[in-house]
Amino acid sequence: KAGRDYSYPAIVKMAERATPFRRFVNPDDPRFANPPSMTEAIKAYCRETGQPEPVEDDEFIRCIFESLAFRYKEVLALLSEMAPFPIRKLHVIGGGSMNNLLNQFTANVINMPVVAGPSEATAIGNCMVQARAAGLVADRWEMRRLINSFLSPAVFLPEGSGEWEEAFRKYKSVTSKK
């Protein structure tokens, strides 16, 4: 609504050049559901939690990407508590799987591999269910083998986990104030 139109590659480049770990938001805070102005909502959150307000677009973008990755870590911890098996990697599917920077941030903060793709998971899943109903594939394992035979997901390995763990503690401190 602010009249700026960036391509996805431009958004990623902007996030890359911004200073890391300067400000954080809780992406699940209700104020971010559908605000009249996302930038104003982020500024208000930062003000209320004693953080520097972002000014430049790259600062907003970096804040959003890092905050999403940190929130993924929190949710993954909850899922790990409930899962009857150890979780050793995170699969990201759909449109988000194409955001390499966010996927790398996520791998860094969860300190495990992130497997990204397919980006068209819904359509592929629909095709597989129809193939199963038509008797063309026997079970979900055959569906997975078929999908894996023609798709190569990207794999992101953790980097710099120490600095990300320290930043996560800061994120937790900030988001616990709300």
For each of these PLM feature ranges, what is it?
Residues 95:
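Glycine- and other small-residue-rich loops at beta-strand/loop junctions that grip anionic moieties
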